[in-house]
């Protein structure tokens, strides 16, 4: 009897040891689905909206979620490559990098004001005397982030195509920051995303700081635009479970049609819906990069 008891104790101990440090099933409290957002807007707003979205996804799917907002677009891509992030809300070019480097899988394309695409814009102070793309020659430009499609890649490619050389440029850290760099006189030109006017209000990056700087629409104006770019994505890391992926996609599409969902998504990245996406939808961006002889690897920073 004593031998049986000792044997049982040993089995329990071995079982306990083998379970130490082992993660639970994905989507549980001990191993939540990790959803990362890029810092293209003010971090505090992204966190607030991201948490609201995660809370609703938990109700709709039964899975547990955890959000994070790293300090750069590239950090989100690398986290997905290392399986530290399961879902990334990735801008267009960042998605292409994630697909190229780590075979990430697109799930959804965002919709803004009924459109699945957007443009990059060049903005200047209204009284600067800069009226066209050619006038940017020799000026200082505030781009957003090295991996931002509308805030750097497309604008810099357009300048290169037209042989226009700025005196210098720097990365402001986000779309609102690039707008403020122009507004506050730290740059002659700022680059960011642009979407059409909706209900009489411009829907570009200036809107993100309109509450704090109510005269920015009059003081800062767009003078040129890039070609159209497919919208941002909701992307899943390689080998993310297919059923969970479909559950999250369906939940996000359902949530986007509710009043609470519309508010959170609008506050997050000015999103008002989603459409199912395929990797081929983004070939137009790859073709543009190829035509301009730009390597994706240049922008993984």
Language-model regions, residue ranges each:
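C-terminal motif of bacterial Sec signal peptides marking the signal peptidase cleavage site
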Residues: 15-19
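Bacterial signal peptide processing site
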Residues: 21-23
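Extracytoplasmic small-molecule ligand-binding "clamshell" domains
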Residues: 26-93
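Flexible hinge/capping segments at coil-to-helix
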Residues: 30, 124-141
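An extracytoplasmic/periplasmic, membrane-proximal ligand-sensing/linker region
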Residues: 30-59, 240-301
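Beta->alpha turn/N-cap motifs
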Residues: 39, 69-73, 83-102, 110, ...
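Hydrophobic/proline-rich hinge and linker segments of small-molecule sensing/allosteric domains
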Residues: 108-132, 235-236
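Pocket-lining segment of extracytoplasmic ligand-binding domains
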Residues: 128, 140-243
């Amino acid at each position: 009897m004593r031998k049986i008891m000792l044997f049982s104790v040993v089995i329990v101990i071995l079982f306990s040891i083998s379970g130490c440090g082992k993660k639970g099933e994905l989507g549980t409290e001990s191993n939540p689905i990790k959803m990362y957002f890029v810092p293209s807007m003010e971090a505090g707003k992204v966190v607030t909206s991201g948490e609201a979205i995660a809370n609703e996804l938990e109700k709709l799917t039964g899975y547990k979620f955890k959000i994070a907002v790293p300090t750069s677009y590239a950090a989100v891509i690398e986290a997905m490559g290392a399986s530290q992030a399961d879902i990334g809300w990735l801008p267009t070019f960042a998605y292409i990098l994630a697909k190229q480097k780590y075979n990430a899988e697109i799930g959804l394309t965002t919709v803004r004001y009924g459109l699945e695409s957007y443009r990059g814009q060049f903005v200047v102070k209204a009284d600067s005397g800069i009226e066209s793309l050619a006038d940017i020659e020799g000026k200082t430009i505030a781009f957003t982030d090295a991996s931002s499609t509308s805030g750097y890649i497309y604008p810099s490619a357009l300048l290169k195509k037209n042989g226009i050389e700025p005196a210098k440029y720097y990365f402001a850290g986000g779309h609102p920051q690039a707008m403020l760099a122009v507004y506050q006189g730290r740059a002659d030109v700022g680059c960011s995303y642009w979407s059409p006017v909706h209900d009489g209000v411009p829907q570009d990056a200036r809107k993100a700081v309109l509450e704090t700087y109510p005269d920015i629409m009059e003081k800062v104006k767009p003078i040129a635009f890039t070609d159209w770019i497919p919208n941002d994505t909701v992307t899943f890391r390689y080998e993310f479970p297919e059923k969970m992926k479909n559950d999250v996609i369906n939940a996000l599409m359902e949530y986007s049609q509710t009043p609470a969902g519309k508010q959170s998504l609008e506050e997050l990245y000015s999103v008002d819906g989603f459409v199912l996406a395929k990797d081929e939808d983004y070939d137009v961006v790859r073709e543009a990069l190829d035509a301009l002889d730009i390597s994706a690897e240049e922008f993984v920073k």
